[in-house]
């Protein structure tokens, strides 16, 4: 059973988006969810209870299930994430260097032709999706 696929197919019906999913050492699952307006503790409990029952029905073997919000430094995984958070500060690490560097911090400035546009100190850097290793929002206080 592909647990990621199970999560991706089930969460939208509950009104949530799958932000990320991790398998932890010892047979645990860590699930990060979101929805417009943010996530509450009650949301996490509801999703956890739902998946506990679903995993039992689907015979998914696991030791521990953690459900939480993605936090202020939310990972950016899908093209829609980069569009949704346009204008916000983000950190992006690339697989291969662009202009002799692999780590960038700047404002998300849109998505075009398979690349993320990042405003780094007034200069637009285009980063192809295929070259993104990790991307996260950078909290501003």
Curated annotation (Swiss-Prot):
Location of the protein in the cell: Cytoplasm
UniProt xrefs under NCBIfam families: PRK00092.2-1 (NF000929)
Name of the molecule in the record: Ribosome maturation factor RimP
BP-aspect Gene Ontology terms: ribosomal small subunit assembly; translation
Function statement: Required for maturation of 30S ribosomal subunits.
GO cellular component: cytosol
UniProt cross-references to InterPro entries, sorted A to Z: Ribosome_maturation_RimP, RimP_C, RimP_C_sf, RimP_N, RimP_N_sf
Family the UniProt entry places it in: Belongs to the RimP family.
Disulfide bonds: none
Protein keywords: Cytoplasm, Ribosome biogenesis
Originating gene: rimP
Principal place of residence: cytoplasm
HAMAP family reported for this sequence: RimP (MF_01077)
Pfam family membership, one: DUF150_C
Superkingdom to which the source organism belongs: Bacteria
